[in-house]
């Protein structure tokens, strides 16, 4: 995996329909990628990774900026047009842990402005808050700048008055569009609903298979073709992050953990984060060898067809192939799950490697998440998520659960220091839609970018 960096571009489209057929043609391009996260849960920098990003147009000049889509945070922040880019060793979060090499390359050379910048000074719709913006990540990367408000356009639609962090110094390669639980102000999903673009603050996520080049997110709607059985609805068990109770954690050879555990379901993370004992159980089930230098388990690169990591959420059972939980470096394969003891805190997280097996419906209004085993298909059966005041189920074809779980986690607090602060120097669409409702459904398609380094 050291040779390939994959970056999914998330292209947004808004339609005032329920049933749509949309054809998109994309160009395959090369792009550097270097990403970590965030403030809901400390995260590792993962050098060979998949990013889900959307191209936004910000301000009166419609500056084009690509930002990572993240259910684990709630802010939008982007690079300023005058941003200075640094290596992490030059501009970093103090006290960041030493991460295993297979997850981290803090001195990779890249441009933080590669994915576009925003010129707030030339935007006629920009409003300065005079607040300092600062964010630091567990891998050591950081960004600083100012907060402001401006309009954000996506396709032919947009929202106004969205709070934006504008970074003028950064050792992070990509800005972030957080679509998680709002905290203190109306973030992107809330404004979509308040400004009449969707009926309810809810969206569904379909990441598709690990070798696919496409996936979809629908704001305000569900695609029934993308899952099997019934959606199982469970409560979000945190006021600040989109985590749920997960049970029945197991492998082919036995249990990984007993009871229920609060786990963040985070599309903004390529890999998952487990406690040491869970990783040990997985490693032992594979007869893997622990690499003391890398602090990870060495595994075979193939031959695990019958092995899996299983778990349950509500009434739904899931099975993740072990092949989806590995990474490769210099011809050696590893079990690619980060230990939460390495990054500090007791938080547990399911990243994209696991979430590809789940069709997810995040309801930020009712604070629930609905899940079902995913079906990989190009078929569509899209239905809007109804207004809670209507006398119908808000999430169609679902069963509900109320469960308790043990939960532990940590919120990062970071200060930033700088040394050696020298400056580093299309798509098309077509389709037919049958109008059935005024309710707008915001949909998205992802395109994979492959970069050989």
From Swiss-Prot:
Disordered as annotated region, ranges: 387-432
Residues with a covalently attached lipid (GPI-anchor amidated serine): 429
Biased composition (Low complexity): 397-417
A GO MF label: aspartic-type endopeptidase activity
GO cellular component, one term: cell surface
Class of enzymatic activity (EC top level): hydrolase
EC number: 3.4.23.24
Cross-referenced InterPro entries: Aspartic_peptidase_A1, Aspartic_peptidase_AS, PEPTIDASE_A1, Peptidase_aspartic_dom_sf, SAP-like
Binding of pepstatin A, residues: 70-72, 138-139, 266-270
Membrane-related topology note: Lipid-anchor; GPI-anchor
Activity versus pH, per record: Optimum pH is 6.0.
Gene3D superfamilies linked to this entry: Acid Proteases
Presence of keyword Lipoprotein: yes
Residues at the active site: 70, 266
Record-annotated Peptidase A1 domain positions: 52-372
PANTHER family: ASPARTIC-TYPE ENDOPEPTIDASE, BETA-SITE APP-CLEAVING ENZYME, ISOFORM A-RELATED
Free-text function comment from the UniProt entry: Secreted aspartic peptidases (SAPs) are a group of ten acidic hydrolases considered as key virulence factors. These enzymes supply the fungus with nutrient amino acids as well as are able to degrade the selected host's proteins involved in the immune defense. Required for cell surface integrity and cell separation during budding.
Similarity remark: Belongs to the peptidase A1 family.
Protein name: Secreted aspartic protease 10
UniProt source species: Candida albicans (strain SC5314 / ATCC MYA-2876) (Yeast)
Lineage, opening ranks: Eukaryota, Fungi, Dikarya, Ascomycota, Saccharomycotina
């Amino acid at each position: 995996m050291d040779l390939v960096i994959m970056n999914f571009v998330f292209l947004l489209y808004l339609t005032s329909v329920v049933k749509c057929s949309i054809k998109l043609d994309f160009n395959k391009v090369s792009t550097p990628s270097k990403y970590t996260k965030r403030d809901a849960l400390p995260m590792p920098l993962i050098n060979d990774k998949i990013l889900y990003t959307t191209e936004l147009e910000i301000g009166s000049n419609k500056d084009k900026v690509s930002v990572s889509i993240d259910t684990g945070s709630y802010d939008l922040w982007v690079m300023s047009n005058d941003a200075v880019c640094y290596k992490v060793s030059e501009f970093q979060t103090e006290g960041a842990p030493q991460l295993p090499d297979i997850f981290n390359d803090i001195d990779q050379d890249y441009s933080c402005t590669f994915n576009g910048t925003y010129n707030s000074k030339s935007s006629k719709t920009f409003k300065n808050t005079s607040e300092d913006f600062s964010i630091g990540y567990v891998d050591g990367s950081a960004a600083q700048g100012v907060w402001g408000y401006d309009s954000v356009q996506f396709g032919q639609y947009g929202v106004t008055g969205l709070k934006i962090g504008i970074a003028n110094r950064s050792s992070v390669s990509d800005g972030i569009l957080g679509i998680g639980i709002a905290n203190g102000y109306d973030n992107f999903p809330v404004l979509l609903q308040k400004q009449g673009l969707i009926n309810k603050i809810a969206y569904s996520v379909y990441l598709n298979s690990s070798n696919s080049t496409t996936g979809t997110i629908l704001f305000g709607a569900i695609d029934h073709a993308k899952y099997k059985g019934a959606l199982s609805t469970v409560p979000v068990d945190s006021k600040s992050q989109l985590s749920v109770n997960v049970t029945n954690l197991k492998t082919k050879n036995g249990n990984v953990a007993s009871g229920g555990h609060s786990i963040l379901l985070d599309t903004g993370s390529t890999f998952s984060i487990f406690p040491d004992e869970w990783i040990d159980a997985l490693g032992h089930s594979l007869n893997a060898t622990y690499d003391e230098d890398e602090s990870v388990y060495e595994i075979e690169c193939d031959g695990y067809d019958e092995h899996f990591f299983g778990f349950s959420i509500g009434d739904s059972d899931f099975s993740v192939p072990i092949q989806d939980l590995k990474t490769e470096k210099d011809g050696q394969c590893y079990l690619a799950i980060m230990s939460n003891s390495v990054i500090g805190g007791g938080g547990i997280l399911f990243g994209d490697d696991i979430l590809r097996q789940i069709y997810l419906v995040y309801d930020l209004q009712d604070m629930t998440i609905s899940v079902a085993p995913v079906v990989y298909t190009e078929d569509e059966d899209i239905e809007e998520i109804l207004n809670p005041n209507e006398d119908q189920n808000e999430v169609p074809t679902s069963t509900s659960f109320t469960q308790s779980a043990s939960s532990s986690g940590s919120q990062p607090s970071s200060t930033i220091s700088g040394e050696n602060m020298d400056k580093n120097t299309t798509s098309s669409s077509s389709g037919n839609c049958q109008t059935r409702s005024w309710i707008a459904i915001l949909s998205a398609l992802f395109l994979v970018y492959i970069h050989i380094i």
